[in-house]
Regions:
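Short glycine-enriched loops at secondary-structure junctions
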Residues: 20, 75-77, 103, 159
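Cofactor-cradling patches in redox/metallo enzymes
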Residues: 40, 86-93, 98-170, 179-183
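Solvent-exposed alpha-helices and their adjacent loops that cap or buttress functional pockets
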Residues: 61-64, 145-147
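Short, hydrophobic beta-strand segments
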Residues: 26-27, 68-73, 125
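Long amphipathic alpha-helical segments
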Residues: 1-61
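A charged, well-structured terminal subsegment
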Residues: 181-192
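Glycine-rich active-site/cofactor-binding loop and its immediate structural neighborhood
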Residues: 64-100
Length: 192
């Protein structure tokens, strides 16, 4: 990234045509079983470091240009590798990610939204079948709030399916980090 900057390449082009396009290839290879989680994490970390190098050169509208997204693993679930990967991919897709961490109760997600009312998307993760009810409860708690019409909810995690996402009232489901970034962009565009 630094070499490209030193050679006079446009920072936005480096991000969009170099890094984001490369991560799309990584995502496809992951989906097709050509690479696995360790390689995906290496690529995501490289992406994150590259974005850090680029940040000073990018105008504020290109970092976070797709808006804010709240990210959390639901109450009772302590898994963060998948969530972190999703966070890096979504951030690299032009979102400002507010990562609440793991074992996050619905009340904390709602409180975070109230502190950041310009948030467009809430992304929730559950990686255990035993925390699927917690995911359902969190979506239900958000649905009961007056701001539900102003946001999109996306869900994911190993045991989650499109059917379950539909059943609990989520707006979107993604099975992996690469498709999560694509889904986030699609949901944000629907709200524009």
């Amino acid at each position: 990234v630094q070499e490209a900057l030193d050679a006079g390449c446009d920072p936005v082009a480096i991000l969009n045509e170099g890094m984001i396009d490369a991560m799309a290839v990584v995502g496809e290879k992951f989906k097709n079983g050509e690479i696995f989680v360790p390689e995906m994490l290496v690529a995501a970390r490289a992406m994150k470091k590259g974005v850090e190098v680029l940040k000073p050169y990018l105008s504020s509208d290109s970092t976070g240009s797709n808006g804010k997204l709240i990210l959390a693993t639901v109450a009772g679930d302590l898994h963060d590798i998948g969530k972190n990967l999703v966070g890096m991919m979504i951030e690299s897709a032009g979102f400002e990610v507010i990562d609440l961490g793991v074992d996050v109760p619905a009340s904390k997600v709602i409180e975070c939204y109230r502190e950041n009312p310009d948030t467009k998307i809430i992304a929730l993760s559950a990686l255990l079948t035993t925390t699927m009810p917690s995911l359902k409860d969190t979506v239900a708690a958000i649905a009961a709030e007056d701001f539900r019409k102003d946001i999109k909810i996306m869900v994911g995690g190993a045991p989650i399916t499109q059917e379950f996402a539909d059943e609990i009232g989520a707006d979107g489901y993604s099975e992996d980090a690469a498709s999560a970034a694509t889904l986030a962009k699609k949901l944000a565009a629907e709200m524009a």
